[in-house]
Amino acid sequence: MLSSIERQFVRTERPLYGHLVTLLENAIARGELPSGSRVPPERTLAQRLRISRTTVVSAYRELEARGLLRGYVGRGTFVCAAPEPEGTPFAWRGKIAAAALRSSDSTLRDIVRHSSDARLLSLAAGEPAIDKFPNEAFHEAVSHVLRTEPLAAWGHGPTEGQPALREAIADRYGVPRESVLILSGAQQGLDLLARCLVDPGDAVVMDRPGYLGAIQSFRAAGAKLVGWDILRADIDELEDLLVRYRPKLIYTNPTFQNPTGSTLPIRARREVLTLAQRYRVPIVEDATYGDLYFTDPPPPSLRELDDHNLVIYLNSFSKVMAPGLRLGWIAAAPSIVDQIAIIKQRMDPHTPNLVQLAIARLIRQGAFDAHLRTIRLEHAKRCAQMVSAIQRYVPRGSLRIGRPSGGLYLWCRLAPGMSANALLDRALASGVAFVAGTAFYPDPAGDSDLRLCFTSVLPSQMDESIRKLGACIADARLSQTA
């Protein structure tokens, strides 16, 4: 059976897990996988098909939901095409809605899990140098709020956010207060925007490669994802995509981009805005890394250059202070803010008030900008330290790396013939994690790429992390020539 699946599997199909579901479902229907037979372990099938284990897990989960497979802890996964006998334990997966199964990719959850696993050195998590968090200033801010506004801190709050924080953001970033909506993290903002703006079948033009959380949110809304090569930033290509697909929106992360670390030049920013105005397409600008420059500030944001109210601006305190804050914000036309607030209140009536009020005080007192100055210097040092470690510990010619001027990430390309997903399996077994490039593409691509976060480990752990990664790369190259 496995050889039959291998022959029929086409790696250019999208989504890959859906293609695999179809092949396995057909094999069950034809009797090639009879009821009661065991399907290959997830890792084995992933290796044979040269795809990520996540893809196989997603396919198996969907087949479980359809009642065709059944997993047993410690025994494996089995075909159960025939009706299950009376007394069989109830299977909840068969009750999951089809729409939920569209978003079965667990890569984001895996990244967070790896970052909290004490056995792993995680170069995967997208987080700032949280050991530099301004603990004393934050403690003072929280104490002040609890002393002076305890009812506001612990009671219900407006869905749009605490007025104090909306005003502080409006003053610092130069936007009207009524245009600001507070979020429980920028990822919530992407989910809300997808729910608010995207109907099933709508096209969304986005960075390629681009933020995997955006890929997941727009795909879950039923969007057709169309990639624009953010590294080439060819404006003619973008115009062709706008003409051909008539997208509902453009999503871009133009400053210290996730995952590449690249920054869109000022001329390209103006040209993107011109095209958006010409074709009447709104832009979602993900600006979560814009404050994280090393030395020189980046070009003005699309929002700052926008003269036509086309840009929805998304930002976050989680990426510049700590992910545990779960605090982000949107700035947009008040009509969009009102609609998003209506959607937000159904799932999250308000973002925690205490954190909002504390951050508002940090901004007003100047502690927020002082923290930014500290981590800009720290991030520049850690980026240089990682580059130096790669030069020392990774075999020459095995890894080509970008050189960002801000943000959190190094975007790397493996030598020809090497697989980032296969390397990730080796790395996890050796105690180090990263993100394979396939997670950042809306189409089958990126298996030669990987993203490393240079701020997610302490400086004292950097050399060990890269040494382990370098050893895995060396082993993988030896396997190529064996």
Segments from the language model and where they lie:
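Short glycine/serine/threonine/alanine-rich loop segments
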Residues: 51, 68, 223, 247, ...
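N-terminal basic, amphipathic alpha-helical segments
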Residues: 1-143, 341, 345-352, 360-363, ...
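Conserved core segment of the aminotransferase class I/II
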Residues: 307-377
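Hydrophobic residues in well-ordered beta-strands that form the structural core
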Residues: 206, 227, 283-285, 359, ...
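Short strand-turn motif at the edge of the Rossmann-like AdoMet-binding core
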Residues: 73, 255, 287-289, 317
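AMP-binding (ANL) adenylation modules
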Residues: 440-444
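Conserved core of the PLP fold type I
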Residues: 145-280, 290-308, 379, 460, ...
